[in-house]
């Protein structure tokens, strides 16, 4: 059991995510997923319904015009971007080169184990403290094509800049290539999550990303998120985590996980140490984006606690997960 989970149990007992009601709801959502529009489609539909007739007509035309790439527009609408920025993205789509289109279409670039690469750039974390920022940046690009567009090409949706891109621009420095923009986005997110990490007091950047900041600063399809402590030595908690993760992924929502180690490696190893992102299901296991390698790895939650796992950045425990709040799904 991780020290964090032990402390959480002492303070709060059993957590809500492993309750029978929560597990049942996750199972119901997973069963319904094949016949239910995903989170992007649902949020997009709500925004279109609320739009003016003229805006709705323009956006429906953009969705139709992009054909098989219509999900890019759908995700942009669901991101909360101004509708004119979405229209600019749609109008510019045909002028993008194939590499830029591929990155915007699918920032992961694959759905099997292996490196995540864009134009010969591997999507690794920029330094040893930005695993959380890299994970948040990857999730952000999966949910917001306008962020992915900027990383891919430096282009913007007209005068609109997603807040994370604005902060990356404000940081300054040489931002000329895909690698430059990917690194700058991570650093901007790292600045953001540590700025008020302890209320009014900054969190020391050398300590990485505090888990509670991933909860409240993750921006994805207008959802809100909650952090949950995980005791991966308990089979019921691992099963509950897997059920919630499968339900979220079936809805198009990635799941950040904090990895840790055993107390035998020292007290500093048992607190959350590294952040990865569950991005898909692979049979009985999951696919995780691991930022130190910049690759997707297979992760079997049922095998935690043994040999260090590449999917966890060579840690062997899971201590914390970030899940979408039920009422917003």
Predicted regions and their residues:
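Eukaryotic low-complexity, mixed-charge intrinsically disordered interaction/regulatory segments enriched
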Residues: 23-24, 29-77
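N-terminal secretory targeting signals
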Residues: 1-2
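Stable alpha-helical elements in mature extracytoplasmic
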Residues: 85, 127, 132-136, 210-214, ...
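Conserved active-site-adjacent core of cysteine acyl-enzyme catalytic domains
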Residues: 15, 20-24, 28-31, 88-96, ...
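Short, surface-exposed acidic
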Residues: 70-74, 147-152, 160-163, 225-230
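Non-catalytic propeptide/linker segments at domain boundaries
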Residues: 56-113
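Active-site nucleophile-adjacent alpha helix/oxyanion-hole segment immediately C-terminal to the catalytic cysteine
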Residues: 6-42, 46, 90-197
């Amino acid at each position: 059991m991780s020290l964090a989970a032990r402390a959480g149990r002492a303070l709060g007992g059993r957590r809500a995510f492993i309750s029978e009601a929560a597990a049942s709801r996750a199972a119901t959502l997973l069963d319904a997923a094949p016949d239910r529009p995903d989170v992007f489609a649902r949020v997009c539909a709500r925004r279109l319904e609320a739009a003016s007739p003229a805006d709705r007509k323009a956006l429906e035309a953009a969705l139709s015009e992009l054909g098989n790439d219509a999900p890019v527009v759908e995700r942009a609408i669901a991101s909360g971007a101004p509708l004119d920025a979405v229209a600019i993205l749609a109008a510019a789509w045909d002028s993008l080169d194939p590499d830029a289109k591929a990155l915007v279409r699918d920032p992961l670039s694959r759905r099997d184990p292996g490196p995540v690469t864009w134009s010969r750039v591997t999507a690794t974390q920029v330094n040893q403290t930005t695993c959380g920022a890299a994970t948040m940046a990857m999730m952000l690009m999966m949910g917001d094509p306008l962020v992915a567009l900027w990383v891919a090409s430096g282009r913007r949706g007209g005068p609109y800049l997603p807040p994370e891109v604005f902060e990356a621009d404000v940081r300054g420095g040489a931002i000329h290539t895909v690698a430059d923009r990917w690194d700058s986005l991570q650093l901007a997110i790292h600045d953001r999550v540590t700025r008020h990490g302890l209320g009014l007091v900054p969190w020391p950047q050398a300590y990485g990303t505090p888990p509670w900041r991933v909860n409240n600063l993750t921006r994805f399809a207008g959802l809100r998120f909650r952090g949950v402590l995980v005791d991966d030595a308990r089979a019921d908690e691992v099963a509950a985590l897997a059920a919630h993760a499968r339900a979220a992924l079936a809805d198009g929502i990635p799941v950040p996980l904090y990895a840790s180690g055993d107390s035998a490696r020292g007290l500093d190893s048992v607190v959350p140490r590294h952040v990865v992102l569950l991005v898909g299901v692979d049979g009985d296991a999951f696919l995780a984006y691991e930022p130190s390698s910049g690759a997707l790895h297979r992760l079997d939650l049922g095998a935690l606690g043994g040999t260090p796992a590449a999917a966890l950045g060579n840690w062997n425990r899971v201590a914390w997960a970030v899940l979408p709040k039920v009422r917003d799904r």
